């Protein structure tokens, strides 16, 4: 019988079929199929929204349903699984995107490793020229009537004249100059390396650098140069005192440049290098390790020098409240550590096929009645074993948090996890992951063995499942083992000034494995009263597989401990332990692989690997401290220069960029500002403070040497006469502000109150606005005449901002094309402004000639360990801290 569907139930089954078809179409990535999909969606929506009632029959429905069932329920379940998987993947992508917003993303592992390896001692700071801000330049001389003479005069001018206008911008320029000096500041100066021949010398003498030689050439060729100066240049040469290993070179420097270079020479970071220093540079635990045979080259020259690395500890405490930064540091340390942990190659492991065959025999797989035991052999391979070995040691070295991946039904994984939790301190695992693993072990193995009810663990419970179980289990051996795990923490020990996270002695010597085996034996002897016999047998067989390898597990524990402690000796930064934002995933099946495949071959780091690891750690740590010193100095300088608009965040960003490993744009702002606050609390390093004081004392001298800016402007209500200036001609330039009332231009611009100026000008009192202004030159006489009486200055002040006022430098001289216009000497040119510009320092040869002193020669060695040749004993004979072989099972 036909019936009519009404209301919400209309088109129910066809709609369901359409949806199933839609899902199938969504799986296909083909573009044409997507177009069909869109059409079907449109048809579906048209059907649902249409007012037309459609009549169908029972028989048709039955046929459709039967057809769907016949197509196979497997396809539907498979489809459902795919949908769930897609949803799960989508959730992971969303979580990853959320994480990306808060955690710095990292480049590929190879690039991070390369960046770490590329941080080297500052060899780039080996100077081939002296540091200079100034250079001498020739300027013409003008007569009283404005005509240019043929004579020239030498003045000190800026080498790189990029001074901006505006007092604030000029102060910012000095901050950038300071930053540039910090980058260029040499660790050492060897004048012999930069000395060049003096072409005008009588006896092939040398001067300190090429720029000094060029200045000497220019002065020697200048017609104005006195004969006595020429004779002096001809006599300029180096003076060697070989017995004292000292050489003096003549140099021509501005007094400020001389002060900088003299400071660099007197505060070099190089120190004499001898065998004792190299001996003490090698980590003490490596020196005393009987497995390594070290020989030192005793033929060090007396001129050998080295730069002591800056290895101060925990100045910023990045582990405290800097989650993203700490995550980046631990990640790069983890990648570096993984690269130096020795590989367990296939020849060092038991053959995978042979081991699986042996395990199959132990399990009597041919007589299996349950499926779960076949999982025991799943995923066991040498690559997983090697990966697990490297992950465990590298994570502990870098203090990276690990998270565990496991399947609860794989009892072998859980039993291997019991070894893992016994050997690795609890702190190394993500809390949630640790709780999940412990709960699985308790509810799958421990509680069923004693016939106890399942543990119902409350999320957020301060106690872990093992801590709860320790109080409830009566069996001494199992409770004792649980107690050990619950109290398994790193011991913090300071060795050679570095905080080390050391393992418990019972783990180091492998004795804890006996404790684990006692607990496992007790569990295998229990009756599992509430569980089927097959379940009990599966657990017992899993325990049997692990207990058969008791000797190898003891050796494995000793091997992990030895490799960890040996590599830990090469870590130079305090090993602070804080849970990291991201984690390193560890599959419990790979732990099973490691437990089952570990052989009797001892694997220890090669001495070359240890030295490489140590050098990279030292270089990164030293660079980290130097960049902190730079950032602290720049922040202090910005405050002392009153740069109130300076964004401190930019200083912190520069600091992080110079550390190489950070992706700065992804560091959250709150951590940037917290880092700024920490940097503010640190004292400025002495050398950097002295350099800043040198700049601070000489800011005016540097400003005076610039052609870009003037130091102020005098404005008046009435015109002022132009005056003769020797450097520029007939101009509106004032060389001093005597007799003028002065107002600070920066304060005036900040307040915007021009009333004071207006009142003074209306009272016919000239006023001097003091501050850095653009020094604009206009030598056209026509423009001078046009602007003479064009405006009343009081009106300019009312209508315009003073910071837009461009004082004009008027030149009237014989070079002007319009010179004939001023043939009438009765006409007196005037201006309503006068530019206040200080006189640059004249170049005086005698005052600029300085003798600089440095060592005649020395050699700086950056890699001290290159003097040490090292070898290892035969691995089979390698011993641990207790003087017993690392691997006892032969």
Curated annotation (Swiss-Prot):
Xref: HAMAP family: Rota_VP2, Rota_VP2_A
Region (Hydrophobic): 404-424, 432-452
Locations listed in the record: Virion
Signal peptide: none
Annotated GO MF terms: RNA binding
Role summary: Inner capsid protein that self-assembles to form an icosahedral capsid with a T=2 symmetry, which consists of 120 copies of VP2, with channels at each of its five-fold vertices. This capsid constitutes the innermost concentric layer of the viral mature particle. It encapsidates the polymerase VP1, the capping enzyme VP3 and the genomic dsRNA, thereby defining the core.
Keyword field contains Ubl conjugation: yes
InterPro entries: Rotavirus_VP2
Protein name in the entry: Inner capsid protein VP2
Domain topic, free-text comment: The N-terminus binds RNA. It is necessary for encapsidation of VP1 and VP3. The N-termini of 10 VP2 molecules form a cylindrical hub underneath each 5-fold axis of the inner capsid.
Quaternary state and interactors: Homodecamer; each decamer is made up of two conformers of VP2, called VP2A and VP2B. Interacts with a VP1-VP3 complex. Interacts with the intermediate capsid protein VP6. Interacts with NSP5. Interacts (via N-terminus) with NSP2.
Organism: Rotavirus A (strain RVA/Human/United States/Wa/1974/G1P1A[8]) (RV-A)
